[in-house]
Amino acid sequence: MIEFVNAKLNIGLSVVRRRSDGYHDLETLFYPVGRFNGTPENPTPFCDILEITVNHSGGGDDFQFLGRHIDCPPEKNLVVRAVNAFRGECVARDVAMPDMKLTLEKHLPDGAGLGGGSADAAFTLNMLNRLTGRRLEKEALSGIALSLGADCPFFLENRPLFAGGVGERFEEVSLKLDGWWALIVKPEVYISTKEAFAGISPRAPRFDLRNLGKLPIEEWKEYVVNDFEASIFPAHPELGAIKEKLYDCGAVYASMSGSGSSIYGLYRDEETIRHAASMFDRGKYVCKL
């Protein structure tokens, strides 16, 4: 079984309050980006390729990682953790699960605010569930996903959704960006979660993102903001410069995704976005929405 693993964009992100457990309640709109329906021989560069099969040779689960280097010990890789968590739930239910062989070809950038690692984990959970005859119900999968990361539950759904809480409480939204293009720029900047939240002052959202589909995209620049930009851009001015450059190159809306460091711009047509992409030397990805 092979899946092409897409990323996500945050359209608007408000840090609403700090919780008693030390986490923060957020409000954001997740939008999938980079989905691909091609073949392994001709993939888009903006997706990961995940293959999972039953390992008939025995000897336990077998993992192979290709493509971009993942800078963490294997046992901390989210795909490995997803398999172990899924197997643990099966053991707890006295459900048999065969050994698996997993190959992850990594293309999505990490540390980008695009949810690449979370997407890999969520796709792993969904694929394992299908391969084992859908042994786990949706609630169980969601619980495992949340234990792996706040973005993981979204990728189980993988469609435009409003998210609250730490990012796990979803509401349907009416938003379609069919025909639009996204230019995503990922500079060589790493922003830790600690740094991202250090300069944040929680506040009420400026705009209710549940109503984003009713607001013309031409007006998003005025109302739809990512709260992290206010604290991160002064510390990393090159990120703010990228956002302004996207606007200068014709973007109708531009924003940082998540806590960065990717900056994206939305464009109406292919000609404009191709020209915009030519203005950046590296770390750029053009995606049709």
Segments and roles (model prediction):
Residues 82-92, 140, 144-147, 241, ...:
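Generic non-transmembrane alpha-helical segments
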Residues 121, 125-162:
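Contiguous, small/hydrophobic- and glycine-enriched helical/loop subdomains that border
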